[in-house]
From Swiss-Prot:
InterPro entries given in the database record: DegT/StrS_aminotransferase (IPR000653), PyrdxlP-dep_Trfase_small (IPR015422)
Protein name: Uncharacterized protein Mb1546
Lineage of the species this protein comes from: Bacteria, Bacillati, Actinomycetota, Actinomycetes, Mycobacteriales
Entries under Gene3D superfamilies matching the protein: Aspartate Aminotransferase, domain 1
Organism the protein comes from: Mycobacterium bovis (strain ATCC BAA-935 / AF2122/97)
Family from the record: To M.tuberculosis Rv3402c.
Protein origin, superkingdom: Bacteria
């Protein structure tokens, strides 16, 4: 069963339809592939050398934040990043 999310490309999201709700802020790798490598964009993979895109995408941090989260939960997820920046990290 698909969750309906384009980023999943058929992989069920942690909290997708038909799945039991997980504890708040569970970090689960959902979209581990770049958008251009999804089945819906297969022609892009064959049409160009995207090594720079692949490199950048491998270094992007994916946070467990979505539009239905409580503001307090979002603040809890992003707070460590603010603390790291304040320390110069």
């Amino acid at each position: 069963m698909r969750c309906g999310c384009l980023a999943c490309d058929g992989v069920l999201c942690a909290n997708g339809p038909g799945r039991p709700r997980r504890p708040a802020l569970t970090c689960t790798a959902v979209a581990t592939r770049t958008l251009h490598s999804l089945a819906t964009n297969a022609e892009l993979v064959e049409s160009a050398d995207l090594t720079v895109t692949e490199d950048i995408c491998s270094r992007i941090v994916s946070l467990p934040v979505h539009d239905h989260m409580a503001i307090a939960d979002v603040a809890r997820v992003v707070a460590p990043f603010g603390e790291g920046l304040a320390r110069g990290g």
